[in-house]
């Protein structure tokens, strides 16, 4: 565990007090603090204030990912006995299952959506459920360090789901039609349009909405973050016939294909250059051993480390290599009995590894910037004394270069966006 709540109460930063006060004043609002900047305790501060006003009877629902609830809420928060007594924790996947009707039948005073970027897709089941839950809740709080994926529409979808600033009254189609510029694409079923940016004439309104109902907190020079060393290890790769065919598939998809079609084509080439491919029946066909495996010993021999992978086929290779030196369970890794923590790139939310290791190796990298950013902040956090080392293993002159470039580009846009919001 990092900072306890009692310690936090004596060390609150001004932005944390301001965040708590904004939540209480606006009632439906979001904290968009960078990972590690401390957004959970301001939310708990607000919950405790609301609970006191309701004579200890506030009904609170906290929705988060399974990883966050298992690795953070139940480990670091619940044992401190600081949540209102009528607090219920539920995973996003459980919430959209059989208990959804039970949740909707309950009158909640407060809905908290942790890692609220989980509702940025307006067509997802969790977005629709959160929208219904927050519609009648007196308070609805969202928090995430990665609110923006590809565009501001991602942020708006979160505001809509939580009914922040009156955005719940809009449908997605009506809002985008009024406020957004569109990009035209062509797919198998003809022409389609995708909202990309806020129309220039509406930017002042949009910025005012965010300023009033959302608090963005970026890293600053006073944080004393440890140095972050990113090492791109380019591994020689002899292109095989299978890779050439897979790469050709990307080109043949065409400029106007849907995003899904493009991602499928890229994913096939990515798999093949790592020695395997998933066939339509989900059977893995292997072409050759992944040459990246030989590069991992250097980092494991130096110190304990996290190895991030994308597909189960990668996990199987890593398990064969490291055997009982590795685990995929965070709590087991924290005991110190294992040299290696194997994490699938989607399982990277909310837990703290800064006292366990300071090296993260991306064995196979997902193109998602949000997953990348969430992962590096498991180790690179406030209060850490040791430099953090990020290693990206990349087969040279393959699609992996483009995947890393896409992540870097989104990182630059995110950094610029957060710095602009902080200074306004």
Q: What are these language model-derived features?
A:
Residues 40-42, 57-77, 149-154, 310-312:
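Conserved Walker A/P-loop ATP-binding site and its immediately adjacent core
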Residues 114-115:
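Walker B catalytic acidic pair
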Residues 92-107:
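Conserved helix/coil segment N-terminal to the catalytic DExD/H
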Residues 1-10, 24-28, 34-38, 42-54, ...:
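Conserved Helicase C-terminal RecA-like lobe
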Residues 59, 110, 127-219, 384-387:
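Conserved P-loop NTPase motor "coupling/switch" region that bridges the ATPase
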Residues 67-87, 162-165:
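Conserved helix-turn-beta segment of the N-terminal RecA-like "Helicase ATP-binding" lobe
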Residues 14-22:
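Pre-Walker A adenine-sensing motif
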Residues 120, 315, 323-403, 410:
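Conserved RecA-like P-loop NTPase helicase motor core
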């Amino acid at each position: 565990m990092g900072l306890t709540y009692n310690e936090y109460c004596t060390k609150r930063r001004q932005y944390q007090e301001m965040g708590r006060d904004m939540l209480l004043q606006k009632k439906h609002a979001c904290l968009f603090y960078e990972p590690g900047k401390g957004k959970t305790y301001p939310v708990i501060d607000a919950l405790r204030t609301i609970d006191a006003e309701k004579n200890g009877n506030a009904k609170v629902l906290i929705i988060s990912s399974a990883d966050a609830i298992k690795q953070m809420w139940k480990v670091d928060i619940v044992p401190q006995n600081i949540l209102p007594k009528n607090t219920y924790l539920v995973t996003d996947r459980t919430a959209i299952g059989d208990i959804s009707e039970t949740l909707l039948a309950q009158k909640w005073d407060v809905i908290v959506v942790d890692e609220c970027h989980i509702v940025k897709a307006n067509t997802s089941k969790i977005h629709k459920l959160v929208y219904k839950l927050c519609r009648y809740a007196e308070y609805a709080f969202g928090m995430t360090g990665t609110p923006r994926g590809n565009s501001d529409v991602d942020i708006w979808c979160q505001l809509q789901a939580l009914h922040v600033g009156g955005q719940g009254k809009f449908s997605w189609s009506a809002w985008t039609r009024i406020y957004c510029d569109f990009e035209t694409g062509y797919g198998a079923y003809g022409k389609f349009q995708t909202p990309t940016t806020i129309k220039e004439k509406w930017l002042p309104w949009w910025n005012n909405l965010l300023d009033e109902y959302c608090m963005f907190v970026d890293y600053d020079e006073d944080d004393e973050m440890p140095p972050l060393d990113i090492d791109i290890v380019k591994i020689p790769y002899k292109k095989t016939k299978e890779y050439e065919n897979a790469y050709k598939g990307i080109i043949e998809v065409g400029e106007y294909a849907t995003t899904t079609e493009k991602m499928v084509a890229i994913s096939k080439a990515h798999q093949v250059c790592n020695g395997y491919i998933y066939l339509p029946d989900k059977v893995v066909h292997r072409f050759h051993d992944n040459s990246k495996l030989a590069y991992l010993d250097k980092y494991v021999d130096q110190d304990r480390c996290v190895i991030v992978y994308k597909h189960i086929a990668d996990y199987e290779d890593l398990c064969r290599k490291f055997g009982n030196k590795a685990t995929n369970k965070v709590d087991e890794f924290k005991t110190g009995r294992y040299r290696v923590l194997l994490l699938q790139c989607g399982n990277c939310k909310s837990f703290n590894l800064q006292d366990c290791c300071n090296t993260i190796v991306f064995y196979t990298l997902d193109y998602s910037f949000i997953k990348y950013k969430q992962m590096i902040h498991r180790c690179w956090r406030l209060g850490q004394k040791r430099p953090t080392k990020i290693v990206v293993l990349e087969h040279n002159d393959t699609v992996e270069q483009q995947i890393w470039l896409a992540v870097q580009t989104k990182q630059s846009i995110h950094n610029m966006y957060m710095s602009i919001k902080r200074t306004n």
